[in-house]
Amino acid sequence: MRIHANCNLPYTVALWGAAIFLAVGCNKKADNTMNFTSAIDTYYGAHPACLWPDPIKFPVQADTSDTSKTSGYDALVDQGLLVRTTAEKKKFIIASKQVNNYDLSDKGRSAWTADVNQPGFGNFCYGHRKVSSIDSSTPTTSATGATTQVAYHYALADAPAWASAAETQTAYPQLHADLAGPQSGQATLTNTNNGWQVSIHPSSGGGQIVE
């Protein structure tokens, strides 16, 4: 009886091993830093940080004697996002007060992020989170529906020029803090049929997020 040795066996085994390694490494469900980073970046790419906690509608009117109401709008006038006009408003039968009327400029309309749920409402958004590091994650599995708590650091990407202006940052302290440097955040990720996705995003002191 002649026995034929399979000289290609080690080579075949090596190929199978490499294929398995690549399949695991490229699997979106794999529990690794790259997939967590991608999930968080994808979520915040569609949920930028904005000036106001709730969408607002222009035009708006503010009493000129109340700088807490006018300073923010005036800073946006300086950046060309709003136009300002003055008027007198009747306060009592024989009295009146000076008010400023603010409305979107052409530049402001192009920078405006409209609210899809409230026609006419919107916000000025100034960037989105870009993960710089995944600091920790709780143990999880590759099963669909599994969750993990992720702690990470990020910086705001794609900030427009108006957001970097000193007047704007003075009028909006949260904007200044967001653009000052790296921030820390936390998120709950859920393993879905399409890979890891953000399911809960606890506040970490960052800017208002458009949902």
Task: For each feature predicted by the language model, list its residue ranges.
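C-terminal motif of bacterial Sec signal peptides marking the signal peptidase cleavage site
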Residues: 22-25
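Mixed-charge, low-complexity intrinsically disordered segments
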Residues: 106-121, 159-181
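Accessory beta->alpha helical hairpin/"wing" motif in late/C-terminal subdomains of nucleic-acid enzymes
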Residues: 85-125
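Bacterial N-terminal signal peptides that target proteins for export
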Residues: 2-14
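Basic amphipathic alpha-helical segments that dock to polyanions
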Residues: 68-83, 87-88
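Bacterial lipoprotein signal-peptidase II cleavage site
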Residues: 27-32
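Short beta-strand edge/turn micro-motifs at domain boundaries
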Residues: 83, 149-161, 177-211
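Post-signal-peptide N-terminal segment of Sec-exported extracytoplasmic proteins
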Residues: 42-75
